[in-house]
């Protein structure tokens, strides 16, 4: 394995690896199939600028070196982290893989992170704000990093996740970075249920977003609920759109004007009668 890494390490960053990986893992499942390995190595060597005359020979060498220590699962799937280790330094590897190790399953937690790092409430994460996020991320994982490297990795993350190349990240970009799981509300069919079923579903929904268990949604709990509600009808939303809809929801639902949405207030908004 070391011999496979020597000529490539330092020649490729996480963004370069990601460009090749995406050709094969379009749906971002985190793995490719064993039958795709030859083509993957071929594209990777092309990215590294290896001469065509020796490319095919090197593909077979790399495949042998990779397969020797790896026990490919019975379903023939090869995880991204197994291949990334061949080409990337430890830190570059971390940038690519931390999102797979700790995916977020809560829009409430996601919005807490969004509000923290969108420090100027612009509705976007700037490069400087992303840099702060990465600094905290490395500290959390007890990894020492210089400011110069931090700036370099911020640029790498922008290359990977800034889809429209405008130099800033929107809600959807950060959701991809944090590997936010499927919208919690997708499992409910509110319009196709009886009154009792709707009440039962409402209880589950409110309990999910009332993370603090106070009987009211506030702060990122409101944000998380708004985000998931909006994405039921508009899959790609911006931070500024979320803020507008949040204001509308509070205007309609926050009857006592305390800046929170009580359980009874949300039920009333949704046309439900619940037991006090």
Swiss-Prot record:
Molecular function GO terms recorded: calcium ion binding
In the UniProt record, what gene is named as encoding this protein?
SCGN
* Residue sites binding Ca(2+) 2 per the record: 118, 120, 122, 129
Among InterPro entries, the record links this protein to: Calbindin_Ca-bind (IPR051001), EF-hand-dom_pair (IPR011992), EF_Hand_1_Ca_BS (IPR018247), EF_hand_dom (IPR002048), EFh_SCGN (IPR035798)
Binding of Ca(2+) 4 occurs at: 210, 212, 214, 221
Q: Which GO terms describe its cellular component?
A: cytosol; dendrite; extracellular region; nucleus; synapse; terminal bouton; transport vesicle membrane
Enumerate the transmembrane spans. none
Q: Which UniProt keywords apply?
A: Calcium, Cytoplasm, Cytoplasmic vesicle, Membrane, Metal-binding, Repeat, Secreted
Name of this chain's protein:
Secretagogin
* Location of this chain's protein in the cell: Cytoplasm; Secreted; Cytoplasmic vesicle, Secretory vesicle membrane
- Residues that coordinate or bind Ca(2+) 1: 71, 73, 75, 77, 82
Q: Between which residues do disulfide bridges form?
A: none
Residues binding Ca(2+) 3 are: 162, 164, 166, 168, 173
**Where is each EF-hand domain found?**
12-47, 71-93, 105-140, 149-184, 197-232, 240-276
Q: How does it sit in the membrane?
A: Peripheral membrane protein
- Give the matching SMART domains: EFh (SM00054)
Q: What is the species of this protein?
A: Bos taurus (Bovine)
């Amino acid at each position: 394995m070391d011999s496979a890494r020597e000529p490539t390490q330092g020649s490729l960053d996480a963004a370069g690896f990601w460009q090749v990986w995406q050709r094969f893992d379009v749906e971002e499942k985190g793995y490719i199939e064993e039958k795709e390995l030859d083509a993957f190595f071929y594209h990777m060597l092309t990215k590294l600028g290896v001469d065509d005359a020796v490319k095919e020979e090197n593909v077979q060498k790399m495949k042998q070196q990779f397969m020797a220590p790896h026990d490919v699962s019975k379903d023939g799937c090869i995880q991204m982290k197994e291949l990334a280790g061949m080409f990337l330094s430890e830190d570059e590897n971390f940038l690519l893989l931390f999102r797979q190790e700790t995916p977020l399953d809560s829009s409430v937690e996601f919005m807490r992170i969004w509000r923290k790092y969108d420090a100027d409430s612009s509705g976007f994460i700037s490069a400087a704000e992303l840099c702060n996020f990465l600094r905290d991320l490395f500290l959390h994982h007890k990894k020492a990093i210089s400011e110069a490297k931090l700036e370099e990795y911020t640029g790498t993350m922008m290359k990977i996740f800034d889809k429209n190349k405008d130099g800033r990240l929107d809600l959807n970009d950060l959701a991809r970075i944090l590997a936010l799981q499927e919208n919690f509300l997708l499992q409910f069919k509110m319009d196709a249920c009886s009154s009792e079923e709707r009440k039962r579903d409402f209880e589950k929904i409110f309990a999910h977003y009332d993370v603090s268990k106070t009987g009211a949604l506030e702060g990122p709990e409101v944000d998380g609920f708004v985000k998931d509600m909006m994405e039921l009808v508009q899959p790609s939303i911006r931070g500024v759109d979320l803020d507008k809809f949040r204001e509308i929801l509070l205007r309609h639902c926050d009857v006592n004007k305390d800046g929170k949405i009580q359980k009874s207030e949300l039920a009333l908004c949704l046309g439900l009668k619940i037991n006090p």
